[in-house]
UniProtKB/Swiss-Prot annotation:
Major subcellular site: nucleus
Keywords of this entry: Acetylation, Nucleus
Domain TFIIS central: 131-208
Record GO biological process: DNA-templated transcription; regulation of transcription by RNA polymerase II
GO cellular component terms, A-Z: nucleus
Protein name per the record: Transcription elongation factor A N-terminal and central domain-containing protein 2
Taxonomic placement: Eukaryota, Metazoa, Chordata, Craniata, Vertebrata
Amino acid sequence: MDKFVIRTPRIQSSPQKKDPGGKIYKQATIESLKRVVVIEDIKRWKTMLELPDQSKENLVEALRELKKKIPSREVLKSTKIGHTVNKMRQHSDSEVACLAREVYTEWRTFIEKHVNRPSIEVRSDAKTETFRKNAQKLLSEALELEMDHLLVENIERETFHLCSRLINGPYRRTVRALVFTLKHRAEIREQVKSGMLPVGTFVQTHKK
């Protein structure tokens, strides 16, 4: 007897009609919420604001990111980010000063109204911090600067940020590449130290 394959037509489900008046909701990550504060990000933006000869573009970027967050009183005290933003209100550039005033006023108003309301803090673990301290040590030696220098901190924090805040292969390789360049390329080292070569650009071009 011959065998036949009988193909039955597929039943296509009718597409659901979209409600023209319905709202489209965008899924939010926990870190995008205003009261969820990643301590590492706060410290990174702080070093961007405090680094001498910082470009206006970077200052505005840091302040705009800070405007998206409302740190608790405890975070403001431990990181001293409030003092840094307060100083930026007197910046010579009107746009930077205006943005700093907006951030400072919003934070102060919220803290006064919600004095006992904590924010959610996200911190790095001890092992991660140990690896990062070692990276800062290598960078400081390559830059011929003290380990607690703002430039050293800024370069390491930018590297950590670009590597998704993970101590992984890309982070280690990027740190090694940065250290090698700073040690063996005197002209680039001086450009980084003088501010002619922005930290973000320097790190991005060496990301592995």
